[in-house]
Swiss-Prot record:
PROSITE patterns named among the record's database cross-references: SAM_MT_TRMB
Cited function: Catalyzes the formation of N(7)-methylguanine at position 46 (m7G46) in tRNA.
The keyword S-adenosyl-L-methionine appears for this protein: yes
The entry's keywords: Methyltransferase, S-adenosyl-L-methionine, Transferase, tRNA processing
Species annotation: Actinobacillus succinogenes (strain ATCC 55618 / DSM 22257 / CCUG 43843 / 130Z)
Residues forming the catalytic site: 155
Molecular function via GO: tRNA (guanine(46)-N7)-methyltransferase activity
InterPro entries the record matches: SAM-dependent_MTases_sf, tRNA_(Gua-N-7)_MeTrfase_Trmb, tRNA_methyltr_TrmB_bact
Pathway recorded for this protein: tRNA modification; N(7)-methylguanine-tRNA biosynthesis
Protein name: tRNA (guanine-N(7)-)-methyltransferase
Family, per entry: Belongs to the class I-like SAM-binding methyltransferase superfamily. TrmB family.
GO cellular component terms, A-Z: tRNA methyltransferase complex
Entry-linked HAMAP family: tRNA_methyltr_TrmB
Pfam family membership, one: Methyltransf_4
Lineage of the organism: Bacteria, Pseudomonadati, Pseudomonadota, Gammaproteobacteria, Pasteurellales
Length: 252
């Protein structure tokens, strides 16, 4: 590898910004920039990013992505925010060749691992982004262009003073719903009950305004769906004795 190539994966580890929201969920400001302390980016992960980004990677841009041109078809696009090491995302892409998957992850070791697994499985219907999800939603995703949004085991930000950092806020749900086609879904999963209740409250608070409905027969959570692969974070939660809560809403 040339020195120029080596800098590509490394520059993705540069400072990123974290969004802050007001108590009613409106976007407020970027509260701080921080260097991601994500552990060592292995040489193999670095090589996967350097050598395969042109096939699997998408970069931030100031206009919406042209999904038919990117994927070469008009299949539904499913966006997953925070795919971790990417194993479950790759598995879903493999199991659903009639859908296109787009994953966002800011941790470069996870991005590198995801690309390696996608390459191993010969996945063609997957693209990944290493950038702040709020900016991607705002600038790169056209309205009514997504078939679904997946958010599995996001950071729960346990302390009450940090709850404003939680990604699931009213404005986030409103923005996501704008990006969904009619019949598109929102699927959240968490192993923290407090965050599960927070997610449910947020979804219920805006569902009439944005036109989404809960498919749960009990009006809250759904049983764990078989189509969602078991993630590393879910396994960790199970070992700690945590419950698992899934939410699934459909856009009218």
């Amino acid at each position: 590898m040339t020195e120029l190539k080596k800098t590509f994966a490394d520059q993705k580890r540069k400072t990123v910004e974290t969004a802050e929201f007001t108590e009613d969920g409106r976007y407020k400001r970027k509260i701080r920039s921080f260097v991601l302390r994500t552990g060592r980016l292995s040489e193999y992960q670095r090589q996967m990013m350097n050598d395969n980004w042109s096939n699997y990677g998408l970069d931030y841009q100031t206009e919406p992505f042209d999904f038919p041109a990117i994927y070469g078809n008009h299949n539904p696009v499913i966006l997953e925010i925070g795919f971790g090491m990417g194993k479950s995302l790759v598995e879903m892409a493999q199991q659903n060749p009639d859908k296109n998957y787009l994953g966002i992850e800011v941790h470069t070791p996870g991005v590198g691992a995801c690309l390696a697994y996608a390459l191993e499985k010969g996945i063609k219907n997957l693209r990944v982004i290493c950038h702040d999800a709020t900016e991607i939603l705002r600038d790169c995703i056209a309205d009514r262009s997504l078939g679904g949004l997946q958010l599995f085991f996001p950071d729960p930000w346990h302390k009450a003073k940090h709850h404003k950092r939680r990604i699931v806020q009213p404005q986030f749900v409103k923005t996501v719903t704008q990006k969904l086609t009619s019949g598109g879904f929102i699927h959240f999963a968490t192993d923290w009950q407090n965050y599960a209740e927070h997610m449910l409250n947020v979804l219920q608070s805006v569902q009439s305004a944005v036109g989404i409905r809960n498919i749960s027969e009990t009006g809250d959570f759904i049983p764990r769906p078989d189509f969602r692969p078991l993630t590393k974070f879910e396994q960790r939660g199970q070992k700690l004795g945590h419950g698992i809560w899934d939410l699934y809403f459909i856009k009218n």
